[in-house]
């Protein structure tokens, strides 16, 4: 069976076949046994005890055609001569089928497969002469054409070798196996890679010795037991382990969510927000609520910038033109926008709230303001301004610059542009003071003249005209500066002098009323340019640049919506238990990293095993191409299979 035993016997005997395929093609010169010189012939193919019969070729004129094949397994030691002659002999018998009685004999031929394999090689097709039965007189019986092909089936050879090796033909061998503890049912260490072993690993009493320990003395091999435990790795390296890998079932209860505390805080804050929309503050409590003292930093929630509901700035109210605006509802919309890197409430955030709270009043009163600017008489404007000043002193006594038009421009100035705004505001104040000096000087002279002697009515009319001209110039300058200021941030339209946290100091209501009444002259006609000079924008709400405010509000709104959507998705996204991602949704970052590393290691091991299998298949394909390349070809005509008898 070994290659070394068959070496040196010709080019065709370098390998030992395991199977032989016999194809009976046709016959000629057969004797006629039927009516009209015909015969119903069929052939019987036999190797050892296996027999196959072809189909019957009816009414053939001595030349039937079958083209049927049969495959036989050869004994393992065919080339060494140890097999019996009958096991290595191919017998071909041609018979005539009889309707009644036994079939009639037409001829027979015998082929020695060992000699054919040694002399002819792998495949041979030739005509063989049919002979009579042994002990009978030879007659002319014709010939039969047979195609004989030797093959080697690696799987059968490997299994056959294992079965022969495990059989103990010697009684001393059986005794030796019992002493060594070798069991008949135990798997062999030399198991083939083609047939992977599914037998589990046995104990140390049932294991066999390695080749190195067989070289030791007989006493040690007979009475010593190996301490090694047999594993599936002692088989071929190409065999994948059949044991299943341990699977870890992850559950949501094994891990604690880090969003639970934040979810409870969000629910409590939303509940308190709904309950805090009641108007319970009176006009006496409003000045205390609009206090400018900065609150202390309180505990921050998950986002890091949300203020608590007890914050005085978030609960402050503003009275604009007699309409009370409460700051609880706008805060819920601008929570994400107020989360700044400083992580603490600031006056900038307070002024940012006024922008959202005063947009409705701006939209309602903006078309009415231009008509109120210059279309009324001086007496009517004085009465309106006095009533408005009284309302302002009641609502915000210490925050006059904010009520004079700063509510609609409540965006906080940037730290980078603070110096630039202060310079612009100083320039504007210097120009306004120069214009005011001209007006007040003339007004003081008019006051002195009125005390000494009454002036004619013509001089009073001229002063009114001059005051109107100065007022028109101030309006033109404001209109010219407005597009330049709109290009800057919204908060930079007014100088730093109008910022209540920089220039305005908190004072009592009485002091503010006295300071307001001091610059008023006794002449009622000259009060109009004076009030216009001190307050260039007398109304708290004036028409704004609609395009700039729309762009700013739209950009802020879209940014807020995007951030709110992202955070809501991060907080509210939940997986169903049937979803495969549910097992990984509650894992932490470190646990996910460990899981990925384990999966990567498992994949690398499987890739190594697949690579070994690919190498084995490549080597096996090379052997097939060398030994039996004909099995890789597609035959032009598939042969018929002979029926087994």
Curated annotation (Swiss-Prot):
Which parts of this chain are annotated as the region Necessary for interaction with RAB4A and RAB11A, subcellular location and endosomal recycling?
581-645
Q: Which species is this UniProt entry from?
A: Mus musculus (Mouse)
The primary site where this protein sits is other
* Name used for this protein in its record: Rab11 family-interacting protein 1
Gene Ontology cellular-component terms for this entry are: membrane; recycling endosome
Q: What does this protein do?
A: A Rab11 effector protein involved in the endosomal recycling process. Also involved in controlling membrane trafficking along the phagocytic pathway and in phagocytosis. Interaction with RAB14 may function in the process of neurite formation.
Q: Which domain of life is it from?
A: Eukaryota
Residues covered by the C2 domain? 1-128
Disordered: where is this region?
171-215, 259-296, 330-545
| Bias (Polar residues) ranges | 282-293
Molecular-function GO term, any one: small GTPase binding
Q: List the disulfide bonds.
A: none
The FIP-RBD domain covers 573-635
Q: Which gene encodes it?
A: Rab11fip1
Ordered alphabetically, the record's keywords are: Cytoplasmic vesicle, Endosome, Phosphoprotein, Protein transport, Transport
Is Iron set as a keyword in this record?
Answer: no
Q: What is known of its domains?
A: The FIP-RBD is involved in the interaction with Rab proteins.
Q: Tell me which residues bear Phosphoserine.
A: 186, 204, 208, 236, 301, 316, 340, 342, 344, 346, 357-358, 383, 434
Query: Bias category Basic and acidic residues: which stretches?
Result: 171-187, 378-391, 418-432, 459-487
How is the quaternary structure described?
Homooligomer. Interacts with RAB11A, RAB11B, RAB25, RAB4A and RAB14.
| GO terms for biological process, alphabetical | protein transport
